[in-house]
Structure formats: structure tokens, C-alpha cells
């Protein structure tokens, strides 16, 4: 195993967990890879120097680095919005957990998920490994639509324990399976939801594949017209791992040939080929069906998603506390969970003696009455929001909601009266992750009198809070 392959496998061990920001010791990494502690320690130190890892609390412990998060976000950026919409719509249609799985070098992990809001449900956490020959997900990964009779279903099913899986491969333009889309539901809801799950998987598969086709049409193979070489100091010869990172960054923006990659990264073609081969052995790069072009594997796309929530909770909480104290308001960070707003962080300050704000930490709220609801879906167009909007709400409520979505998309901040709480005004602004999509809403909430008297200042504070939290994620 080359040094580059070993180093990138270390990154995968750290990155492909439910929480890649949690400390992982050199000893644990070495045991996972069957390597010596001393060699692993040296590689971790070099990976830290180029930003793929960073030091964590505890002796000899590491967590995922900023460059790895940026790489992951860049790889997901062309597909993040369409994947999010497809998974959220399928979750709305079924009420069950909908998720995307990608594989590399013999392992498969969840890279995106919208979890069911039922109390009893079948989970699928980002970073979770998927294995077992009985699993519909595993079997779907070995199959494409090629050669299927028109009458054959485009999905596979399995029952393991008390969980049913309905899965279908996401097929790229070359016929390769780039990922697997699936729904998980408890056996006891099969009569109610299994048929819905089948239809939802088929529709979401078409939606995601259409997004992939559109992107490939916009970004053709670059082998004949590579961009200019990346800037670097004259005479600079990057280390093998630093050069591999250049290649990964380049392939995150689209597939390319060896010669195109060499030109774009400022590396010799022979060195670029060796490094691409090392990246392939680590499971991060795929060869195209004709072996003339290479691309980043979809498993990388799970890294930034798994890191987002724990980063906001750990590192974003002090920012929320400072802003809430400075403005004498309640501060929140909320994310989208299905079509509900879910509170990750809260600081309950309040203007007014004798007043108290009820806590929302760890609770979900219907999006129609959520402080950050319109902000959380501002990346979607009106038709997509309408398709996701809960059927129990009226057309008038949808129209009001859409006006607010358009307002925050235009202004970058939204001030609104609480939907069902008299005397409260909220201000929200978008928090964006490494893919550039909205991952959370930063919200300030207070009494109507206090918020209206300070609207301009508090809108600025909310934008600043959102920008500071966004900077943690990219």
C-alpha cells in the first residue's frame, strides 16, 4: 500500500462515522486499518498539515479537517439541492425514512438521509455502514437498469428483522451505479406504506438521475480542454499527499482524464496517473466505463453532511449565545427534518421582566409555524415548495409562505410575526454548508415591541450570526 493510499484510508476512517467531528485516537485508527501506531501517527500528522484532519481533544486524537469538509461539499454541490428535494418529497409521500447510500472499496455507507418523524421508525443515519447480503441496498448496488425487461420493477426489497427496505440503484450516464436510494419502514406499517414506498423510490430515482444527466450535459468531459494549472510557487514540488489533495479537489468539480487532471493541477502526467491510481485504491476515485476519465466517488458526499450538525452544536452555540445576550433576544439554530423545523441550538434570553420563552431544543415544529421555516426551504422553487407543503394547510397559507420564501431569497433575511404566538416577532437568515446549500436557519426571537424597535440592528445581527455559523461549515 502506498503512502497516499494509506493516508486517504485514514481520512476515510475518520470521516465515515456518524459524527466525524468526534475525537478518534491514532491507536483506534491503526487498529481499524491493521497498521502500526507509529506509521499511522506520522501520516495523521501530515494529513493535519494539509487540512484533511485536525487535532481533537485528548492525547493523539484527531477529527475531520476543514479541507476534507470543503472537498466533500464541493463534490456534492452539483447534486445537493436535487438530492435534498427528492429525499424530502419521498419522505413526505411515505412518512418513512428515505436515504442515499454510496459505496467504495468494498464498504457502503449512508451519505444523505431524511428520517421518519414517527415515534417508532427505522433509522438511517449519515455515516452508518450498510452491509449484509440480504439487504436490498447491498443487492441494488450490484445492479443497474441495463438489460432489465420493461416489466421488471426498478427496485429491490428485503426484510431484515423488523425493518423492510425498498431500494433502487442511482445510475450515471455511463450505466454505472453511483449510489443507492432506499426507504426503510417497520414491518408493522407495510400494509399502510409499502406500496407508497415503492412508488416514492421509483419517482425519487428518476428525479436524482435527471439531475445527474443535466449536470453532465452542462459540464462535459474536460480531457480536451482542461483549465489552466492551479497557482503554485515556482519550483514547488508538493508532497504526495498534498498533490493527491490537488487531484481530489479538481475531480470534485467534474470528471477528467489523466492529462487534463495533470494540466489542471500542475503535476506531471506520470505523477498524476500514479496518484489517481492511489486515490482509486483508497476508494475515493472511480474510473469511467471506458477508463479514459476519472471522477470522485459519491461516498465523499456524506462527510460534510455528517459533520454539519455536531459542528453547529459544538462551535455554533457560543455564537448564538453571544448574539442573544448582546441583543437581549432568544437565539436559535434550526434545521429541516422532513418538512418540520428542528431546533439544534437555543439560548433563551428575553426582553421584558417576568417573561419566559418555552424551550424548543430537540423538538420539531411544523414548518408553516416555524420561525425559520421559509428560510430553510429558500433554495427550492415555488413548485417544489408547493409539492412538499403539507396537504392539511390551505392555499392561502401556502401563498403567504411562498411570499416569505421569495422575500428571504431576495433580501437574505426575513422578519415576520409569529404564525400562532401573539406578541412575538422572529428574524431569520440562512446558514449555508460546504455545498453552498441552506442547511439551517439562524433565528432571533423576541417580543413585538423589542424587535420592531430594533429591526434594522437585529436583522444585521441575524445575518452576521448566520455568516459566522456558515464559516464553521466551509
Give the positions of each predicted feature.
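Amphipathic alpha-helical effector-binding/dimerization core
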Residues: 63-146, 305-389
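Short, basic/aromatic recognition patches
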Residues: 78-92, 136-168, 196, 208, ...
Amino acid at each position: 500500500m502506498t503512502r497516499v493510499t494509506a493516508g486517504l484510508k485514514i481520512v476515510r476512517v475518520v470521516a465515515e462515522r456518524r459524527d466525524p467531528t468526534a475525537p478518534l485516537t491514532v491507536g483506534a485508527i491503526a487498529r481499524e486499518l491493521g497498521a502500526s501506531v507509529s506509521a499511522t501517527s506520522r501520516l495523521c500528522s501530515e494529513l493535519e498539515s494539509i487540512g484533511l484532519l485536525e487535532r481533537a481533544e485528548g492525547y493523539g486524537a484527531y477529527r475531520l479537517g476543514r479541507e476534507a469538509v470543503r472537498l466533500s461539499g464541493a463534490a456534492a454541490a452539483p447534486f445537493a439541492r436535487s438530492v435534498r428535494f427528492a429525499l424530502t418529497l419521498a419522505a413526505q409521500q411515505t412518512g418513512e425514512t428515505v436515504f442515499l447510500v454510496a459505496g467504495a472499496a468494498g464498504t457502503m455507507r449512508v451519505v444523505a438521509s431524511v428520517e421518519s418523524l414517527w415515534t417508532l421508525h427505522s433509522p438511517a443515519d449519515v455515516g452508518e455502514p450498510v452491509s449484509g447480503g440480504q439487504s436490498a441496498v447491498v443487492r441494488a448496488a450490484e445492479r443497474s437498469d441495463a438489460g432489465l425487461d420493461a416489466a421488471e420493477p426498478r427496485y429491490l426489497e428485503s426484510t431484515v428483522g423488523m425493518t423492510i427496505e425498498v431500494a433502487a440503484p442511482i445510475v450515471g450516464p455511463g450505466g454505472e451505479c453511483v449510489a443507492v436510494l432506499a426507504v426503510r419502514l417497520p414491518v408493522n406499517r407495510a400494509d399502510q406504506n409499502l406500496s407508497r414506498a415503492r412508488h416514492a423510490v421509483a419517482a425519487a430515482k428518476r428525479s436524482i438521475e435527471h439531475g445527474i444527466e443535466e449536470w453532465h450535459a452542462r459540464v462535459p468531459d474536460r480531457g480536451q480542454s482542461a483549465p489552466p494549472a492551479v497557482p503554485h510557487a515556482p519550483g514547488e514540488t508538493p508532497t504526495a499527499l498534498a498533490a493527491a489533495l490537488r487531484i481530489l479537489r479538481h475531480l470534485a468539480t467534474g470528471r477528467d482524464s489523466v492529462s487534463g487532471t495533470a494540466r489542471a493541477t500542475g503535476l506531471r502526467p506520470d505523477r498524476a496517473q500514479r496518484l489517481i491510481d492511489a486515490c482509486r485504491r483508497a476508494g475515493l476515485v472511480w474510473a469511467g466505463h471506458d477508463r479514459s476519465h476519472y471522477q470522485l466517488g459519491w461516498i465523499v458526499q456524506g462527510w460534510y453532511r455528517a459533520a454539519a450538525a455536531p459542528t453547529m452544536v459544538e462551535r455554533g452555540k457560543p455564537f448564538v449565545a453571544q448574539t442573544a445576550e448582546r441583543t437581549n433576544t432568544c437565539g436559535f439554530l434550526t434545521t429541516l427534518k422532513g418538512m418540520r423545523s428542528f431546533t439544534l441550538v437555543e439560548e433563551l434570553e428575553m426582553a421584558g421582566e417576568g417573561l419566559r420563552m418555552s424551550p424548543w431544543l430537540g423538538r420539531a415544529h411544523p414548518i408553516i409555524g416555524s420561525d425559520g421555516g421559509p428560510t430553510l426551504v429558500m433554495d427550492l422553487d415555488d413548485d417544489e415548495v408547493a409539492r412538499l407543503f403539507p396537504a392539511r394547510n390551505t392555499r392561502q397559507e401556502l401563498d403567504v409562505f411562498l411570499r416569505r420564501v421569495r422575500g428571504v431569497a431576495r433580501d437574505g433575511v426575513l422578519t415576520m410575526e409569529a404564525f400562532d404566538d401573539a406578541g412575538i416577532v422572529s428574524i431569520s437568515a440562512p446558514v449555508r454548508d460546504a455545498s453552498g446549500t441552506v442547511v439551517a436557519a439562524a433565528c432571533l426571537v423576541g417580543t413585538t415591541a423589542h424587535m420592531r424597535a430594533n429591526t434594522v440592528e437585529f436583522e444585521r445581527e441575524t445575518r452576521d450570526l448566520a455568516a459566522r455559523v456558515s464559516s464553521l461549515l466551509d
